[in-house]
């Protein structure tokens, strides 16, 4: 521990409030421990700048692009109270310890704290790889100064992302749609997903056939084998076909269904024999300990966690002292961790399960940063999952168990055994030679598999690689006779490339060296929130809007969605972090162009974009004469008008909405024609409403099938008669006011029930649907009770009090008495008996009120009783932490009242204006982005 300060007190600042209690317990009364709650300063929105700066070189980005990209900082509105509190505490201590995280973001937070607090006492920088007593004690022995190179790298990244987004996003708004955004990593991630969907759209399936057989030995043991060759030529499998359905090799036999069935029949009575037996030793090594990237991948495979949930749960485990720091590219373990893992493996599984020498691993990541250890259980002796089960939530326990197993297994012995490969064959009655193959692996020593086995991603091949699967074959020798008990011809179809899952997208981004694994969760959440991607059955499906965005970026901003270029930017940021590259020169090359490589800068590209044909950008050819267009209200199909051969007149184009649940690769030429045919129709006429005389039709719309009434438009004569009947009103000057035309009547519309079908729905069904809401009657106080169908299903309504009912069919059968019985039960909603909160997350440091998650009309939302914010679609209630809730509420406050404050008030925490020099000084202006989750 450090030497005591003069008055026995020192202030230690961490990032997260959840660390405070744990660290305070280790340090005792000599220290005041507090948190900054993430970043305290950031670049403001340009609209929030003081008036005198809005029109200058700072006005566009809140960065002075003419003065070495000097950033203009303000203290975040929701952090002013926290900064004031830290300043008060700093007056009562004799030393300041900045213990924010040890990555770029954490280093920047420490720098900003020092700049804003302006301490007059000694300042020490320290980091904790884990929140344990031992780690904290070691950290006090490794105190250092703030690493200004790391701060430079973070500042460069923040300015880079600001410039990238602010220059390119407005182009998307003008040419594709409002509310869209471009980002250095998010745009590349979106391109990956779109490119995979393009591959699926262009894919042509190929059919191929083979034979499978069940064979019996003379000792009556059975095993399965598969046809691999006919007349000495290998039989084609899925890997032999290109994505256009053609064979990639002429040296294979492509069996048709007829050939396969004929061969199976001809082999029915043929005598089979073993032609060769080959046995090889089998060895499998354990996987390396977790990095940030591999943890997200494996948690997605094994636990079905999204990347964001994984990082949130890992953050809680780290801050509570259960695991080491969770943002790392390193696969290395410290000496004490290796000893702990080997010792525990030996105790749990036996000494034979631990190799004689410790295992070491090398990173495979393209841009790995080895500053931290791999993710592992905290401490010099690991707690088993059973030992911590009672103190962790279910998600925390499952992730801890995964990390513990992976860490232990990484220091265990190889799994060993043997793999046997057998070839057997026969001559068919039609003279053709058929050869079958079978293989089996027998694991004689499980080694690390006793603790853990790594998951795998889905592949596109039907014949998935099963080399690690354990399967035993009977004892066989060359020449042994076999009987074919069962032979079957089997048809197969090649599969398109699988869509990305969160796990495989994270893996690809990591392998390409794009972005940092610690930001992948936020990147994936962003592309979901922007509507570029949605999750369907675990796969990432791009929207048609994403197609338009990617096409625009590829054609007008090609380098900025290029994988190699984006990866190189990440390498350059690493060089800046190591002090090998100047941030000012690098940003100048990026924005203005030039440099050693004569790069074309972003500014000249934007300044010389020329005319971008928005219609062309938002058009995707589906088939000859059929185009999908991304419109203001969603995607739709358009077919070219046809020419009347007799008159030469061209008909208007035919249009049809595209269902929201139809994936891009499912919109084939045939499907497009089907939708257009439906679009030509005004709907299926069901009959006439006897009450109104209006025609009732059933249609298929973008959001599913529905029924509606056709209300004839008023004729010019009717409109004029209406206007003539209206009294004339006059302006004050005596001139008559123009009369307003009547508003068109709005037709009644109702979605079909889930149990109904567009082709069979009747007029009676339609009239019932259009009659909703149905009035059941009134209660004893005279309040009307109705029943209707809504977004979340059928429900009763009495004033503001709504109650769900069982099924859609009950809408037409439920009685007033049954409704009154439901209302007589304890209320689950409404003011009189509010539903308990879905979650309680602690006290908000800004409002000092309890934060809860409630169920609202439009879904769950977070509130402290003053500020409300909807739970983001990319997050779950279970994954929300106190820190995340505080962050979301702070963001909402910043977007609301904070913007209405006079701009001058936001300049109080402006960064120091000292210009950067070659030799870094503590007064050098720097910035900070929102801390990554």
Give a label for each model feature:
Residues 2-11, 21-22, 29, 146, ...:
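Basic, low-complexity terminal or inter-domain segments flanking catalytic cores
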Residues 263, 267-288, 293, 299, ...:
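Pre-Walker A segment
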Residues 1-158, 167, 172, 241, ...:
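Intrinsically disordered, low-complexity regulatory segments
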Residues 175-179, 194-255, 302, 326:
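C-terminal helical "lid" subdomain and adjoining coupling/linker elements of P-loop NTPases
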Residues 101, 296-298, 302-306:
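A conserved hydrophobic secondary-structure block that centers on an alpha-helix together
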């Amino acid at each position: 521990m450090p030497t005591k300060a003069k008055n026995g007190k020192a202030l230690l600042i961490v990032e997260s409030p959840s660390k405070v209690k744990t660290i305070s317990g280790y340090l005792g009364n000599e220290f005041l421990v507090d948190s900054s709650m993430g970043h305290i300063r950031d670049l403001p929105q340009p609209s929030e700048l003081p008036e005198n700066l809005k029109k200058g070189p700072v006005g566009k980005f809140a960065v002075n692009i003419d003065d070495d990209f000097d950033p203009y900082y303000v203290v975040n509105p929701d952090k002013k109270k926290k900064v004031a509190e830290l300043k008060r505490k700093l007056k009562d201590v004799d030393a300041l310890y900045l213990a924010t995280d040890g990555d770029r973001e954490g280093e920047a937070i420490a720098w900003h704290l020092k700049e804003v607090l302006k301490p007059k006492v000694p300042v020490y920088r320290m980091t904790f790889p884990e929140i344990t007593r031992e780690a904290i004690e070691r950290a006090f022995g490794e105190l250092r100064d703030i690493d200004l190179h790391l701060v430079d790298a973070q500042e460069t990244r923040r300015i880079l992302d600001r410039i990238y987004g602010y220059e390119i996003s407005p182009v998307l708004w003008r040419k594709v749609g409002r509310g869209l955004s471009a980002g250095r990593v998010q745009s590349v991630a979106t391109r990956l997903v779109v490119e995979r969907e393009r591959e699926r759209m262009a894919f042509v399936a190929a059919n191929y056939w083979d034979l499978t057989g069940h064979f019996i030995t003379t000792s009556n043991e059975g095993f399965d084998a598969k046809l691999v060759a006919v007349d000495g030529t290998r039989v084609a499998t899925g890997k032999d076909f290109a994505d256009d359905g053609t064979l990639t090799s002429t040296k294979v036999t492509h069996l048709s269904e007829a050939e396969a069935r004929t061969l199976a029949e001809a082999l029915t009575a043929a005598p089979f024999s073993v032609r060769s037996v080959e046995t090889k030793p089998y060895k499998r090594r354990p996987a390396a300990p977790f990095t940030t990237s591999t943890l997200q991948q494996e948690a997605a495979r094994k636990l079905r966690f999204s990347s964001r949930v994984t990082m949130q749960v890992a953050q809680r485990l780290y801050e509570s002292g259960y695991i080491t720091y969770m943002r790392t590219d390193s696969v290395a373990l410290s000496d004490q961790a290796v000893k702990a893992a080997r010792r525990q493996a030996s105790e749990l599984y036996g000494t034979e399960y631990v190799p004689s020498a410790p295992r070491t691993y090398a990173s495979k990541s393209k841009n790995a940063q080895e500053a931290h250890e791999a993710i592992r259980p905290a401490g010099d002796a690991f707690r088993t999952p059973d030992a911590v089960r009672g103190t962790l939530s279910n998600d925390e326990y499952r992730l801890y168990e995964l990390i513990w197993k992976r860490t232990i297994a990484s220091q265990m012995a190889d799994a060993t055994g043997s793999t046997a490969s057998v070839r057997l064959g026969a001559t068919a009655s039609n003279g053709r030679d058929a050869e079958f193959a079978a293989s089996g692996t027998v694991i004689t020593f499980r080694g690390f598999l006793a603790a853990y086995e790594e998951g795998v991603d889905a592949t596109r091949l039907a014949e998935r690689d099963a080399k690690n699967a354990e399967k035993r074959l009977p004892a066989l020798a060359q020449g042994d006779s076999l009987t074919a008990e069962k032979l079957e011809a089997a048809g197969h179809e090649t599969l398109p490339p699988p869509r990305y899952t969160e796990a495989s997208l994270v893996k690809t981004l990591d392998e390409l060296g794009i972005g940092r694994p610690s930001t992948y969760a936020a990147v994936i959440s962003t592309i979901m929130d922007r509507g570029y991607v949605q999750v369907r059955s675990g796969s990432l499906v791009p929207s048609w809007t994403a197609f338009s965005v990617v096409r625009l970026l590829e054609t007008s901003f090609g380098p900025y969605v290029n994988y190699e270029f984006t990866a190189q930017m990440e390498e350059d940021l690493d060089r800046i972090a190591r002090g090998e590259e100047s941030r000012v020169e690098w940003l100048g090359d990026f924005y203005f162009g030039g440099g050693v490589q004569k790069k074309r800068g972003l500014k000249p590209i934007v300044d010389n974009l020329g005319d971008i044909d928005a219609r062309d950008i938002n058009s995707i050819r589906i088939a000859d004469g059929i185009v999908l267009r991304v419109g203001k209200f969603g995607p739709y199909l358009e077919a070219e008008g046809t020419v009347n051969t007799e008159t030469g007149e061209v008909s208007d184009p035919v249009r049809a909405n595209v269902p929201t649940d139809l994936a891009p690769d499912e919109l084939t030429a045939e499907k497009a024609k089907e939708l257009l045919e439906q679009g030509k129709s005004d709907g299926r006429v069901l009959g006439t409403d006897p009450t109104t005389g209006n025609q009732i039709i059933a249609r298929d719309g973008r959001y599913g099938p529905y029924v509606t009434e056709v209300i004839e438009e008023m004729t010019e004569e009717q409109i004029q008669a209406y206007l003539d009947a209206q009294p004339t009103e006059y302006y004050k000057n005596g001139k008559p006011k123009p009369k307003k035309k009547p508003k068109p009547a709005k037709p009644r519309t109702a979605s079909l029930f889930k149990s109904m079908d567009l082709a069979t729905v009747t007029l009676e069904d339609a009239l019932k649907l259009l009659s909703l809401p149905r009035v059941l009657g009134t209660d004893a106080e005279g309040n009307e009770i109705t029943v209707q169908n809504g977004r979340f299903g059928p429900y009763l309504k009495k004033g503001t009090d709504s109650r769900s009912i069982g099924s859609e069919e009950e809408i037409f059968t439920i009685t007033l008495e049954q409704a009154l019985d439901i209302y007589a039960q304890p209320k689950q909603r409404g003011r009189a008996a509010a539903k308990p909160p879905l979650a309680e997350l602690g006290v908000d440091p800004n409002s000092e009120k309890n934060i809860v998650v409630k169920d609202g009309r439009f879904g769950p939302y977070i509130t402290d009783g003053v500020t409300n914010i909807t739970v983001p679609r990319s997050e779950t209630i279970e994954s929300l932490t106190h820190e995340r809730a505080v962050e979301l509420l702070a963001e909402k406050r910043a977007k609301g009242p904070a913007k209405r404050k006079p701009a001058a008030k936001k300049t109080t925490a402006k960064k120091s204006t000292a210009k950067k020099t070659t030799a870094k000084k503590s007064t050098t202006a720097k910035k900070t982005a929102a801390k990554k989750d």
